Design a protein with these regions (language model features):
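Membrane-embedded alpha-helical bundles of multi-pass transporters/translocases
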Residues: 1-178
Length: 178
C-alpha cells in the first residue's frame, strides 16, 4: 500500500504541477487553465460521490484496475491530443476520475493494512500506519518538484519569455514529463 501510495502521489503531483506551464507554453492560452481546472474539479468530485455506489458492485481489485485503466487512457489521449480543449478536457476527466477512485482505494488499502496487522500480530498500530501518509505526501511533492524543475530547465521553458520561444522538442519534453 505504501509503494502504491508513493507512486500515486508522485504521479498526481507531477501532473498537476505542470498544469499552468502546459497551458501557457504548449496550449498558448494560460487563461484556459482555469476552465480546465474547473472541469477536473467537477470530474473528481463526481467520481468521489459515485465511488460508494460503484464499490458495492465490483471488487476492490477490479475497481483499482478500472481506475488505473482510466488514468492510462487519459494520459494516452492527452499525449496524442491536438491543442484543442475538448480532447484535452476529455483526457483530463479520464485521468482525474481514475485518480479519484485510486485515491480512495489507497486509503481503504491502508485501513486494510491496519486490520491485517491487528489480526496477524494482535496489535492495532493505526497511528504509526496512518502517520506514513503525510510523509509520503511530502516526499511525493518533493520528487514532483524535482521532476518539474528538471523538466523546465531541460525543455527551455525556464528561460523562455514567450510561448513561441519554446521549441517543439521542449514541448515534447514537457508532455512526456507530465
Amino acid at each position: 500500500a505504501v509503494i502504491s501510495m508513493a507512486l500515486f502521489t508522485i504521479g498526481y503531483t507531477t501532473t498537476t504541477s505542470f498544469g499552468t506551464y502546459f497551458f501557457k507554453y504548449a496550449f498558448k492560452d494560460e487563461g484556459m487553465y482555469g476552465v480546465f481546472a474547473a472541469i477536473l474539479g467537477v470530474a473528481q468530485i463526481t467520481a468521489l460521490v459515485i465511488f460508494p455506489a460503484i464499490s458495492k458492485k465490483i471488487s476492490r481489485k477490479t475497481f483499482y484496475t478500472l481506475g488505473t485503466a482510466l488514468v492510462l487512457a487519459g494520459y494516452v489521449l492527452f499525449f496524442l491530443s491536438p491543442m484543442s480543449i475538448v480532447p484535452i478536457g476529455i483526457a483530463g476527466v479520464l485521468i482525474f476520475v481514475g485518480e479519484a477512485f485510486i485515491q480512495l482505494l489507497i486509503l481503504m488499502f491502508l485501513s486494510d493494512t491496519i486490520e491485517y496487522g491487528q489480526w496477524k500480530l494482535g496489535k492495532r498500530n493505526q497511528a504509526v500506519t496512518l502517520s506514513v501518509q503525510p510523509l509520503i505526501n511530502k516526499l511525493g511533492g518533493a520528487v514532483a518538484t524535482g521532476i518539474m524543475t528538471a523538466t523546465l530547465l531541460v525543455s527551455g521553458i525556464n528561460s523562455a519569455k514567450t510561448p513561441d520561444d519554446v521549441t517543439s522538442e521542449g514541448l515534447m519534453i514537457l508532455k512526456l514529463a507530465m
